[in-house]
Swiss-Prot record:
<keyword id="KW-1003">Cell membrane</keyword>
<keyword id="KW-0997">Cell inner membrane</keyword>
<comment type="function">
    <text>Transfers a phosphoglycerol residue from phosphatidylglycerol to the membrane-bound nascent glucan backbones.</text>
</comment>
<dbReference type="GO" id="GO:0009250">
    <property type="term" value="P:glucan biosynthetic process"/>
</dbReference>
<feature type="transmembrane region" description="Helical">
    <location>
        <begin position="26"/>
        <end position="46"/>
    </location>
</feature>
<comment type="pathway">
    <text>Glycan metabolism; osmoregulated periplasmic glucan (OPG) biosynthesis.</text>
</comment>
<feature type="transmembrane region" description="Helical">
    <location>
        <begin position="77"/>
        <end position="97"/>
    </location>
</feature>
<keyword id="KW-1133">Transmembrane helix</keyword>
<dbReference type="InterPro" id="IPR017850">
    <property type="entry name" value="Alkaline_phosphatase_core_sf"/>
</dbReference>
<dbReference type="GO" id="GO:0005886">
    <property type="term" value="C:plasma membrane"/>
</dbReference>
<keyword id="KW-0812">Transmembrane</keyword>
<comment type="similarity">
    <text>Belongs to the OpgB family.</text>
</comment>
<protein>
    <recommendedName>
        <fullName>Phosphoglycerol transferase I</fullName>
        <ecNumber>2.7.8.20</ecNumber>
    </recommendedName>
</protein>
<dbReference type="InterPro" id="IPR054288">
    <property type="entry name" value="DUF7024"/>
</dbReference>
<dbReference type="InterPro" id="IPR000917">
    <property type="entry name" value="Sulfatase_N"/>
</dbReference>
<feature type="transmembrane region" description="Helical">
    <location>
        <begin position="1"/>
        <end position="21"/>
    </location>
</feature>
<dbReference type="InterPro" id="IPR050448">
    <property type="entry name" value="OpgB/LTA_synthase_biosynth"/>
</dbReference>
Length: 763
């Protein structure tokens, strides 16, 4: 209703101003600004909803602002461009409509009415309400009920007898198992669900609605609320360090805890969370690539579910044979939005809905088949009698191609349990939430029936039953939950460990690189990973007086304040204010001690603007002074005009990438010498090794032969035509996820370049 009201008020404001208000610059600007805010809010809501399926929520703050955890990046480029174009078009149309009758005399009454209606449209919009609620949740002091309901369990299980297999199905919510709504979509796993304890009303709460948040909620009994924005959990060295979670209890009780997934463990800080809470054996994309049968069989996120669950079965079998007590957690990925992925071994590769194939439903049908096969192997084994199997969704499905059909149903998370020691078939309709999962499992294993805010659904009462407004209650507890991090509020002295690539201050440790925004009562960490904006772009958003400490590779800050370090890949520390003074210090010791020193200087807005503009220069436009092209730093030598076909810098250099251009092209500002040596330090990828690689300058072509290891080759060129472009054409670019960023489409690699140098031998 509020959505319709806000649209009606918006249209009324536009019509009244366009036809009755007349000409007045101030009223026009004010009305256009408010109407434009309405448009921006709703486009933000649409964009957020596209990722989360739940509008503007904590998942947006935690993930989308910096990390794009919601999707393979390539699949969102077109929607992003579409949103930007729509924004420009709507603003242009608004301005044109509002000025349609600009030659008519101004009428204050109608102008005021139009402005009030515009303000009303903003206030009534769901986007404004959601943002307001998020802001309120950030500013609350806490809720007195938190101390009443937050309970810390005993650290051990008195007499543990059962092993645990816990399967997180990516976005695999219980709604998919409604056979009336989606006939024969989940027959294999649905049949298993009906054999066990099936909890049919597991609701989703704020702070539990994306993968790492769902894992934290299900193991620690609390939502994932943090004292920082973005994906900073990937940079911290510990995760809710004061909490006792399910993994801690299992480890203290003699369990060996294992976690297996197909994606990179660093993604969203899963490795930090698991290591902080009892898991000593972690297997992700990097760990599995040396043991799986086919390392090239991957999707955009990592290994397919059939591969991951095969490895999980091998772990289960080996651990069971060893006789040691263990837990085995695994996380699937094939059902990740927006489309999902189809494993090649499943029989169910296609599911039609409304008379046409639907990729998301197809991925669900395939993945559930793989999960069911894994479970049936366990059930058929002699070790099932000593095992508890848990199957749950990590969160409700986000905006995938099945989402509009899911939204027509009563949506709940999946959570069911199969007990090998005590088979029990029952559907339990008790109201519960994801925070209750860990407590329910702990209860079955013989421990307490509570963890944090979670309660066992077999012997306790969930917060979802206690509070009718449980979502609002959880948001009110957000400050209390944030305090559990015990996060430092100041930084005076700090230590950088050059070997471990970490910084320590006030008892906390973070991975490098890192940007800190420092105020009187708060230190906000802003990390950089493959999934977030580069730190210099994040720093460019700081206000002129914001104090910062920036620890990064020297060359990244050299173009601003330390040109002598333009080619250094060592660590440097910069601190100051963008509108004031900045310092840069080279980290030249293994254990480097530093202190913060923020001077209260006069702010220079011209300096601020210059710093921001320089920080925002894209990598390929950066130029440095050097007599060669150094590929492990961003940019190119000053002599280079432009280049293409080259991927991002890595620690050793850069790959050619045929996705960015069929050939490597380096265009220099001036003609290359009449006679020169081209010294190339490089290596080849895949089938490009030990094959002739054409290298052209003007009309002259030579060949380069490289192996898989880095070597240096010198080619002798004549350049009578004064050509200024160097072209290298790898003969067989290979599509691969080697060294790729999680969620990005595969690159097509040819050669890996470390350095290219032009040596003038003319005369």
């Amino acid at each position: 209703m509020s959505e319709l009201l806000s649209v009606a008020l918006f249209l009324a404001s536009v019509l009244i101003y366009a036809w009755k208000a007349g000409r007045n610059t101030w009223w026009f600007a004010a009305t256009l600004t408010v109407l434009g805010l309405f448009v921006i809010l709703n486009i933000t809501l649409y964009a957020s909803d596209y990722f989360t399926g739940d509008g503007i929520n904590d998942a947006v703050l935690y993930t989308l602002t910096n990390s794009l955890t919601g999707a393979g990046v390539g699949k969102y480029i077109l929607p992003g461009i579409g949103i930007a174009l729509a924004l420009v078009a709507v603003f242009g149309a608004l301005g044109w409509i509002l000025r349609r009758r600009r030659h008519h005399p101004h009428h204050v009454g109608y102008s005021l009415l139009a402005l009030l209606l515009a303000l009303g449209s903003v206030d009534a919009s769901p986007a404004f309400r959601q943002i307001t609620e998020l802001v309120k949740s950030q500013m609350r002091d806490g809720d007195p009920d938190f101390a009443v309901y937050y309970k810390e369990p005993a650290k051990t299980i008195p007499n543990p007898k059962l092993n645990l297999v816990y399967i997180y199905g990516e976005s695999l919510e219980r709604t998919y198992f409604d056979n009336d709504a989606f006939p024969n979509l989940t027959p294999e796993l649905g049949a298993l669900k009906n054999e066990g304890l099936d909890f049919s009303h597991t609701m989703q709460l704020p702070g539990t609605d994306y993968t790492i948040a769902g894992m934290v909620a299900s193991q620690c009994g609390i939502p994932l609320f943090a004292p920082f924005e973005g994906n900073a959990s990937a940079s911290v060295s510990s995760f809710f360090p004061q909490n006792i979670c399910l993994g801690d209890i299992l480890k203290n009780s003699g369990y060996q805890n294992y976690f297996v997934q197909g994606a990179n463990l660093r993604f969203a800080g899963k490795d930090v969370f698991l290591k902080s809470h009892g898991f000593d054996h972690l297997y992700g994309a990097e760990e599995l690539k040396t043991v799986v049968a086919d390392p090239s069989y991957r999707n955009d996120w990592g290994f397919y579910d059939d591969t991951v669950l095969d490895e999980a079965w091998k772990k289960f079998e080996a651990l069971s044979r060893s006789g040691q007590r263990f837990s085995l957690f695994t996380l699937t990925v094939d059902t990740h939005h927006p489309d999902g992925f189809i494993s090649r071994t499943c029989n169910r590769k296609r599911y039609d809905y409304d008379g046409k194939p639907n990729q998301s439903f197809s991925a669900v049908s395939c993945s559930q088949e793989n999960i069911a096969e894994f479970i049936n192997k366990i059930k058929a084994s002699p070790w099932f009698k000593d095992t508890v199997i848990v199957v749950s969704s990590d969160h409700l499905a986000m905006n995938n191609t099945a989402w509009k059909y899911l939204n027509k149903q009563d949506r709940n998370n999946l959570f069911f349990i199969l007990r090998g020691d005590k088979p029990q078939q029952e559907t339990l309709a008790v109201k519960r939430n994801t925070m209750d999962n860990g407590a329910t499992v702990l209860d079955i294993l013989g421990g307490d029936n509570f963890i944090g805010l979670g309660r066992s659904s077999l012997s306790g009462q969930s917060l979802s039953e206690v509070f009718l407004n449980v979502k609002e209650k959880v948001l009110a507890m957000k400050p209390d939950i944030i305090r559990l991090w015990n996060f430092p509020k100041e930084i005076k002295a700090f230590t950088i460990d050059r070997d471990k690539n970490t910084i320590a201050f006030s008892g906390s440790h973070f991975r490098l690189p890192l940007l800190l925004r420092v105020s009187d009562k708060r230190v906000e960490p802003l990390p950089e990973s493959e999934y977030s904006a580069p730190l210099r772009f994040q720093l460019a958003d700081f206000a002129p007086r914001d104090n910062f400490v920036w620890i990064d590779r020297c060359y990244k800050m050299a173009q601003l304040w330390a040109p002598a370090l333009a080619l250094s890949t060592d660590w440097c520390v910069s601190q100051g204010q963008l509108g004031g003074q900045q310092t840069v210090q080279h980290v030249d010791k293994a254990q480097w001690q530093g202190k913060t020193a923020f001077k209260d200087t006069m702010i220079d807005m011209e300096r601020y603007k210059g710093n921001v503009d320089t920080l925002k220069i894209v990598d390929n436009d950066i130029r440095y002074k050097a007599d060669s092209f150094i590929f492990n730093v961003a940019g190119a030598p000053e002599e280079v005009k432009q280049f293409s076909g080259i991927s991002r810098p890595e620690s050793w250099g850069r790959w050619s990438n045929a996705q960015l251009g069929d050939e490597v092209k380096i265009e220099y500002k001036a003609p290359l010498p009449k006679k020169f040596d081209l010294v190339i330090t490089a290596k080849a990828f895949g089938d490009n090794a030990n094959r002739p690689i054409p290298v052209r300058v003007g009309n002259e072509e030579q060949t380069l032969v490289l192996g898989h290891d880095v070597s240096t080759i010198t080619l002798h060129f004549n350049n009578p035509t004064d050509a200024n472009t160097l072209v290298i054409a790898p003969p067989a670019p290979v599509s691969t996820n080697e060294g790729n960023i999680l969620g990005h489409s595969p690159r097509k690699l040819g050669i890996g370049m470390v350095e290219i140098k032009v040596v003038n031998v003319e005369g």
